[in-house]
């Protein structure tokens, strides 16, 4: 074996580049940006900026819209805060519902007032207010929440209202406008004077020193547009709209119908402006009589409560009341007097121009020929209501479907007139006296 000094000269010299490969230097920010730019197109930066702007706009829209409604009524899981909810539940103790029957005022300070509460089936207590309640929040006769230890008032509660009464409030506005109601131009103007003008321009009535009308009766044959006009009113105004069917107030047990009417007006008084629409009022508003058996006593009690709420000892407030019926001659005189019902609007049969307008309204969404003579079809439908004219349009569409055509022609409408008007005369909903007068 050769000595060490001999074979060291044959050893391959160490390359500094290989050492650098084994221990590479760390990358700085410029190198990282350069690596990120590899395999990217010329518009990558612009697309990334547009994506960030889109996400920011979408986030603002979601924050503005809020939580979407779900079938379960729960918020999305991303909005849950279980820890905070548990802490809040541990801090807040369950309360007992009581009624404040009397307020004992203190001459020195209102904060030292005493309150007499009545706990149902327990006893009456004289208590004070909790730390979170102001003396101005509590009134005599209202429901309050009390703690279980000292019975101190911790929370003012809203009045108790039957859920069936709460469900009468119309949440979503109907899609019917005044332009969708044909043949009722004069009736719509009189209706808007009573409903919309006092809500939009109350100063006119104040200057004249008169109270605006608060009750209106819509009467006429079936199918002339009474309920349709009420739906248009609900679409037009921003006031709370409550729809009541007369038969809903006819209850089995004594006093239930009167209680529902009372709670209905209590709920209406809590609103800034409210419109109550009683459809088919003849179900509870018939003339009072004694049949000897007492079968209609409960219905009469319900009507008496309605009469009292309309114009009784307590003021009605900013509540407009609409009634609709096709039998005005059967209603009680006390219900029809001015002060309770200030204006009566008759919905009669439409004239020739009104019938043509109604046909155009119902045919607006149909696939029809352009050269249909609506005045001719309207002239062939004398003494017909708006509902019967709508049936004519529906039957014309059925004739077109039966013939496997994509559009309805004038002949289809003429055949529909023959079927609806001529074939259903014995089932006509028009009153006899109106047929005679026409």
Swiss-Prot record:
Chain sites annotated for binding ATP: 220-227
Pfam families according to UniProt: AAA (PF00004), AAA_lid_3 (PF17862), PRS7_OB (PF21236)
Residue spans of biased composition, Basic and acidic residues class: 1-15
GO MF term set: ATP binding; ATP hydrolysis activity; proteasome-activating activity
Alphabetically ordered keywords of this record: ATP-binding, Cytoplasm, Nucleotide-binding, Nucleus, Phosphoprotein, Proteasome
SMART domains found in the cross-reference section: AAA (SM00382)
Chain positions found as Phosphoserine: 90
Region span, Disordered: 1-31
Subcellular location as annotated: Cytoplasm; Nucleus
Matches recorded under InterPro entries: 26S_Proteasome_ATPase (IPR050221), AAA+_ATPase (IPR003593), AAA_lid_3 (IPR041569), ATPase_AAA_core (IPR003959), ATPase_AAA_CS (IPR003960), NA-bd_OB-fold (IPR012340), P-loop_NTPase (IPR027417), PRS7-like_OB (IPR048723)
Gene Ontology CC annotation, any one: proteasome regulatory particle, base subcomplex
Gene Ontology annotations of biological process type: proteasome-mediated ubiquitin-dependent protein catabolic process
Function: The 26S proteasome is involved in the ATP-dependent degradation of ubiquitinated proteins. The regulatory (or ATPase) complex confers ATP dependency and substrate specificity to the 26S complex.
Family: Belongs to the AAA ATPase family.
Protein name per its UniProtKB record: 26S proteasome regulatory subunit 7 homolog
Source taxonomy: Eukaryota, Fungi, Dikarya, Ascomycota, Taphrinomycotina
Gene this chain is encoded by: rpt1
């Amino acid at each position: 074996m050769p000595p060490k000094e001999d074979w060291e000269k044959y050893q391959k010299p160490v390359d500094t580049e290989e050492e650098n490969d084994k221990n590479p230097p760390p990358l700085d920010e410029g190198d990282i940006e350069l690596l990120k730019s590899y395999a990217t197109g010329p518009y990558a930066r612009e697309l990334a900026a547009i994506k960030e702007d889109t996400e920011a706009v979408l986030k603002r829209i979601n924050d503005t819209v809020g939580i979407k409604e779900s079938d379960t009524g729960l918020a999305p899981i991303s909005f849950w805060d279980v820890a905070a909810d548990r802490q809040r539940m541990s801090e807040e103790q369950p309360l007992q519902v009581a009624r404040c029957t009397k307020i004992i005022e203190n001459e020195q300070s209102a904060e030292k007032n005493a309150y007499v509460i009545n706990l149902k089936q327990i006893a009456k207590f004289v208590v004070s207010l909790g730390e979170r309640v102001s003396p101005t929040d509590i009134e005599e006769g209202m429901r309050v929440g009390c703690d279980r230890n000292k019975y101190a008032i911790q929370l003012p509660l809203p009045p108790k209202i039957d859920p069936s009464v709460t469900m009468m409030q119309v949440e979503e506005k109907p899609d019917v406008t005044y332009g969708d109601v044909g043949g009722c131009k004069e009736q719509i103007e009189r209706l808007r004077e009573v409903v919309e003008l006092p809500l939009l321009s109350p100063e006119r009535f104040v200057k004249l020193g008169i109270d605006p009308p608060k009750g209106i009766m819509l009467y006429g044959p079936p199918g002339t547009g009474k309920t349709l006009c009420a739906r248009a009113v609900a679409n037009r105004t921003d006031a709370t709209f409550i729809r009541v069917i007369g038969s809903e107030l006819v209850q089995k047990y004594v006093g239930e119908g009167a209680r529902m009417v009372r709670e209905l007006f209590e709920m209406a008084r809590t609103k800034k402006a409210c419109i109550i629409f009683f459809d088919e009022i003849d179900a509870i508003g018939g003339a009072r009589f004694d049949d000897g058996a007492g079968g209609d006593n409960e219905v009469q009690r319900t009507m008496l409560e309605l009469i009292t709420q309309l114009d009784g000892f307590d003021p009605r407030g900013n509540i407009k009341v609409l009634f609709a019926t096709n039998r005005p001659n059967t209603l009680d005189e006390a219900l029809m007097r001015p002060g309770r019902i200030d204006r009566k609007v008759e919905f009669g049969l439409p004239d020739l121009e009104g019938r043509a307008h109604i046909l155009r309204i119902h045919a607006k969404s149909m696939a029809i020929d352009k050269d249909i003579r609506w005045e001719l079809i309207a002239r062939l439908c004398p003494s017909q209501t708006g509902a019967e004219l709508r049936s004519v349009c529906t039957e014309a569409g059925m004739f077109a479907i039966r013939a496997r055509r994509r559009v309805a022609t004038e002949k289809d409408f003429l055949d529909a007139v023959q079927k609806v008007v001529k074939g259903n005369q014995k089932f006509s909903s028009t009153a006899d006296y109106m047929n005679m007068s026409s």
